[in-house]
């Protein structure tokens, strides 16, 4: 009987768990502390530091079903999604991993056993590839597994040799392929027809056994490791006896749901496949804290959403539709990934808001694009058209390319990139794969942090740095870095500023200006007050006053984070944090500005928890245990297997290594001083605590009292009094404007006496005074109506600015153009202008030349009338 996709996923995890592998949950789609990745795109991403040897875990075998996104950056499958059988923006990667435990024999044996015994794939339908020089893998497949030699293909290209980068861990691969049969076109891997659909790769086994050096040398790793990956959608298609991933159960159900929502009956349209794919990536990205924006990961999400909306529109969707598919997705995948149900309301709202915003410009943008395509003489859409659609209507270039491709056209990508110029800071900027892993700093030194219990302690200098080099001595007055065997100084981490203070010796010591992590060592940066040597004993003393202020702000940050989730929703996730002595700053994911009421509600909730005076409790526990207990793990943070959990009553529980108050009451007072947006989908709150908060409130109270005194009212009535004054001012401004218009009308009537004639044509050129520049337009319209036929040029000087306006009745525009006339005068007063033949305006910056310029009009007109 055919297995469902969910059953295949579970069977894989259970199989390897039975083989002693630790089941590890899928990591976030936002890579943790990895600048080389835009999104998690493989199962091994979360284990990279384990493979590099910079991280230790309690297990040496692991298995996972990893959520992956490939759209943007190096792995960009977006333009092919929906048009091929196996391209997706979101997919699941099944994997088993060995960290210096088993190697090729067991990895190959496990893979073969799972495919042929658990999934019961026919052995004669499988063939494998090995790296051309990997005789060991070839022999295992042939001698141990029993695969005929003719079904083991040696591949010499990079397809069968994997590396993490230009340097670092690498090794040969062995790929397992499934043969769909002779009735499907295509050849085996390595043949000219290998791109056909007959032979489909289903599992890649990577044998990490070398460490590539910068000079190209490959040294054997002391503990070879295994990294494997099998696409869940691909293996499901084979087990369910279909040839396209879009025909498996999950996609068919999503496609049917899409068709029902947009109102179509046929399930064959490729746009249905696009929408079904995109709802998966968009929903999971939002659940992992990514919000639509104009840069980085948020821009990739926006591109995917807008591509889905365009395809829904193409299908005939009426109104917003995309967000309605979240329910169907939760039905399909909510059991495996509970976050879909937990954050369903937030995902739906974010998608709905984004779709509504884009829908306002989609129709107009499509008209512009279709007009451009209809007028196109060649086969390439110009880059400036692509840019206009992006800049004005929010059309990502790949969306325009999508439409063009449907009409057999392409876009001028180079021209688009040129038009974007420095405006374009998109997802590709966040993806940098040129990393030399051998040059990443490693240190055998380790400092013991004792700062939770003490603010001073005796320690020994274990290493000194001067100008980036390790030294034995540091001279008095020299700036450098000191490493201690143990230290009470907190090293900057998790947004909390590093401690300052002094390392005291009999001769003087060292002034610590900042503290940071250097591998596992605590690095004290500053200046030597006296000569220091490795091995010296020091008294490490933290600046206690500053540390205390930081504690207040850090604990308040935890309370505020919990309050934001309570008031705004569980989608709120930390996007950045700064905890200093004088303030705290907190960036978080949210799709709209907070209302004044919401800001006050958060502030009140935090102060209620401060008044409750909860004791702060810390506890060390396993990471999974902490998550199960409800501890909040922050996106972008990397945690050890054992973590420190900081709790404040039942209100807040977070994983945190920072320093905190003993009771929430120690914070004293919490005051939000600003809430603003720093990027699309990211808000920022700045706040103060303790005496700083009190001083802020006192200053505001003083200012309000001063304002009330000026307004001659009490503090409680100041707001009402300001509103009254604003209304009075508006009334007076209207009266003044009315009077100025009356003056202008009167001046216009007086100007009729200044009209001259040139060759029988009425001409008025005049320097008017005493009116607003905005009245010139009305004045010239009235004058044109009164004279019937003629040419008028009016100038006005206001301070150091000149305003000019020219009017020509339509019967004379074949002789005199208003734009040419006003530009002629403007050039003489340091400006320029233009407009229609019958009406044009200009400005200038040389009022001292205005009279001379106006006097020159008659001679200029003599030549034209």
UniProtKB/Swiss-Prot annotation:
Q: Which reaction does it catalyse?
A: tRNA(Ala) + L-alanine + ATP = L-alanyl-tRNA(Ala) + AMP + diphosphate
How, per the record, is the cofactor bound? Binds 1 zinc ion per subunit.
Q: Does the keyword Transferase apply?
A: no
Name the SMART domains on file.
tRNA_SAD (SM00863)
Task: Give the chief site where it resides.
Answer: cytoplasm
Q: Which GO terms describe its biological process?
A: alanyl-tRNA aminoacylation; negative regulation of DNA-templated transcription
Return the Gene3D superfamilies for the record. 2.40.30.130, 3.10.310.40, 3.30.54.20, 6.10.250.550, Bira Bifunctional Protein, Domain 2 (3.30.930.10), Threonyl-trna Synthetase, Chain A, domain 2 (3.30.980.10)
Question: Pfam families under this entry?
Answer: DHHA1, tRNA-synt_2c, tRNA_SAD
Q: Which domain of life is it from?
A: Bacteria
Keyword Nucleotide-binding belongs to the record: yes
What cofactor does this one take?
Zn(2+)
Gene Ontology molecular function: alanine-tRNA ligase activity; aminoacyl-tRNA deacylase activity; ATP binding; tRNA binding; zinc ion binding
Q: Where in the cell is it found?
A: Cytoplasm
Q: Which UniProt keywords apply?
A: Aminoacyl-tRNA synthetase, ATP-binding, Cytoplasm, Ligase, Metal-binding, Nucleotide-binding, Protein biosynthesis, RNA-binding, tRNA-binding, Zinc
- Binding locations of Zn(2+): 554, 558, 656, 660
Q: Which InterPro entries match?
A: aa-tRNA-synth_II/BPL/LPL (IPR045864), Ala-tRNA-lgiase_IIc (IPR002318), Ala-tRNA-ligase_IIc_anticod-bd (IPR018162), Ala-tRNA-synth_IIc_core (IPR018165), Ala-tRNA-synth_IIc_N (IPR018164), Ala-tRNA_ligase (IPR050058), Ala_tRNA_ligase_euk/bac (IPR023033), DHHA1_dom (IPR003156)
Write down the EC number: 6.1.1.7
Any Gene Ontology CC annotation: cytosol
UniProt family annotation: Belongs to the class-II aminoacyl-tRNA synthetase family.
The record's function comment reads: Catalyzes the attachment of alanine to tRNA(Ala) in a two-step reaction: alanine is first activated by ATP to form Ala-AMP and then transferred to the acceptor end of tRNA(Ala). Also edits incorrectly charged Ser-tRNA(Ala) and Gly-tRNA(Ala) via its editing domain.
Q: What is known of its domains?
A: Consists of three domains; the N-terminal catalytic domain, the editing domain and the C-terminal C-Ala domain. The editing domain removes incorrectly charged amino acids, while the C-Ala domain, along with tRNA(Ala), serves as a bridge to cooperatively bring together the editing and aminoacylation centers thus stimulating deacylation of misacylated tRNAs.
Protein name as it appears in the record: Alanine--tRNA ligase
Q: Which gene encodes it?
A: alaS
